[in-house]
């Protein structure tokens, strides 16, 4: 997306693409004289997300580069484990989340846990991918056993056939070789990766919808993501209406404090007030109406 926008302004902007996952990334950065770096962190596999985060850390903290979105925004993007720690450390309301790196600790926790369902999450994956409802102690114990097994937990690697425009997407997949090769490469990468050695569990918040609040600079947009089946994330079913001002103020206060100016925030309404479920610095808008200015 960055390339598409900048290429249309090549007459006024000098730019170059640097692959932060390539072996010579640092040499290319040092050889140039750049005013700004536009980051596009990967969100498909943990292996490349970790590599990207580490190199962006060097770029920002050791070389003093100016980057947008910021390092802070990239670190909490597509990293549910890190996000849970960050939210808790900053006393930001969110569903209670437990991360276990010790199998016995996780099993003991479930043996004493009374409230179900409980949510199991894969560390990386958008649109509700990798989210599993554990409806009983038996299901939760089995989930933990798989988390610490040699196979581990796997996210959905194949296309989501429940999403809309299936025929259009299949035609594009069939006719567009470049797109097909790209998608197959992504599917293989997800298939070959598994999460093992730790487990992420989260309290279930009853809901019929999530709020999606987007901040871009000083502009704010919001709509409801309606629930389809068990989840609102990834349903692509939206409801438009005037969002509560206290919801926008809630997001503004948090993003102002932490200087997060490119954010999509998914929020539950609960008896404890607003709870942040996800925060993403890279996001899309499927409907131009979502950007309507009031």
Regions found by a protein language model. Give the residues of each.
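Conserved N-proximal alpha/beta basic substrate-recognition cap immediately N-terminal to
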Residues: 2-108
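Hydrophobic alpha-helical segments and helix pairs
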Residues: 84-144
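Coil-to-beta-strand transition motifs
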Residues: 92, 208, 260-262, 271-274
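Protein kinase-like catalytic core scaffold
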Residues: 118, 200, 221-222, 263, ...
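Conserved protein-kinase catalytic-loop segment immediately C-terminal to the catalytic Asp
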Residues: 119, 268-269
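Phosphate-binding site of ATP-dependent enzymes
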Residues: 135-250
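C-terminal active-site "lid" helix and adjoining low-complexity regulatory extension at the edge
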Residues: 238-242, 257, 269-294
